[in-house]
Amino acid sequence: MSESPETPEPSPAQSPEAAPEQPQAARPVTPGSQASFGTYGGRPVSFVRRGTRLQGRRQQAWEEHSDRWAVDVPRHIANTSVHPDYVFDAEAEFGRSAPLIVEIGSGLGDAVCHAAEENPDWDFLAVEVYTPGLANTVIKINSRKLSNVRVVEANAPEVLATMLPAGSVSEVWVFFPDPWHKSRHHKRRLIQPEFAALVAAALKPGGLFRVATDWSNYAVHVRDVMAGSADFVNLHDGERRGPESPLTQVWQSGVESLVGGAPVKEGRAPVSTEHTGPNEGVDETGGWAPRFEGRIRTSFENKAHEAGRLIFDLCYRRL
């Protein structure tokens, strides 16, 4: 996820042991403590902050190491907001000039830390609103002695809009975002036309936007959104269509059983795939990328496989 021009593909990860001895002036970092839901700046947010309290080793890791690995951003209104005057200086932060990869919704840090370990010449910024996830990422950074990862607790659209200089990012990753199944919640989905425009602004020309989801409805949504963007080209346009399409396989297998637009437990309802759209039967559009080898298979992805769901990868190049 060989096309040209294209940034090089990274090739594709837990217990806190010794921390790397890299002295640096401490920075005050305060994790948010106020739950966020509803809107920000008049727009629905794509997340619900469930659990911001830290305990045990997470609390210890955050207290001891967040001043080194967490980017402290001045807030605007909400505790995950970014003041519009703040600009992230990656070269100053990492002490070098290197390709910058931004993972949005980095969770517990498995993917970003594994990628950083495999690609020491690349720098990584993990964007997350789940404070325990950030603390877990800090634990991994220290136990693996990584120096090329930073974490930031912030709302992703603001990070892309103002925090990151235009044209400064080599790749943006969004792996397994919240699908917001119910129709009335689709407006909360992270990937919308406005979001695609923000990604385009942050990326360098030729930079990559990688997406992965285990829900066909969201995959079709992303494909439709990106098809409407003049800023990107699908690197796998028309590929894996017809019987080879994972979407065709989902439609014909009925693996995603839904009732009222939300997933239900196995055996609780008859098979229905009408949520995927009117083109049920054979996907003649395709456009699905092969699995991105740079993405480690996390426990989250493993659960999707165990449930029988297929993974949809999409990869777009910034024009």
Curated annotation (Swiss-Prot):
The region called Disordered is annotated at 1-44, 262-288
The annotated regions of Low complexity compositional bias extend over 14-26
Where do the TM regions start and end?
Answer: none
The EC code for this enzyme is 2.1.1.33
What cellular component terms from Gene Ontology apply here?
A: tRNA methyltransferase complex
Per UniProt, S-adenosyl-L-methionine binds at E103, E128, N155, D178
Class of enzymatic activity (EC top level): transferase
| InterPro entries with a match to the protein in the record | SAM-dependent_MTases_sf, tRNA_(Gua-N-7)_MeTrfase_Trmb, tRNA_methyltr_TrmB_bact
Quote the CDD domains the UniProt record gives.
AdoMet_MTases (cd02440)
This enzyme catalyses:
guanosine(46) in tRNA + S-adenosyl-L-methionine = N(7)-methylguanosine(46) in tRNA + S-adenosyl-L-homocysteine
Cystine pairings recorded for this chain = none
Q: In which pathway does it act?
A: tRNA modification; N(7)-methylguanine-tRNA biosynthesis
Q: Which residues bind substrate?
A: K182, D214, T298, S299, F300, E301
Keyword Hydrolase in record? no
Instruction: Please give the PROSITE patterns that the UniProt record associates with this protein.
Output: SAM_MT_TRMB
In the record, what terms sit under GO molecular function?
Answer: tRNA (guanine(46)-N7)-methyltransferase activity
Q: Which domain of life is it from?
A: Bacteria
Instruction: Quote any Pfam family the record assigns.
Output: Methyltransf_4
Q: What does this protein do?
A: Catalyzes the formation of N(7)-methylguanine at position 46 (m7G46) in tRNA.
Q: Which family is annotated? A: Belongs to the class I-like SAM-binding methyltransferase superfamily. TrmB family.
Q: What is this protein called?
A: tRNA (guanine-N(7)-)-methyltransferase
Which source organism does the UniProt entry give? Arthrobacter sp. (strain FB24)
Gene name, Swiss-Prot/TrEMBL: trmB
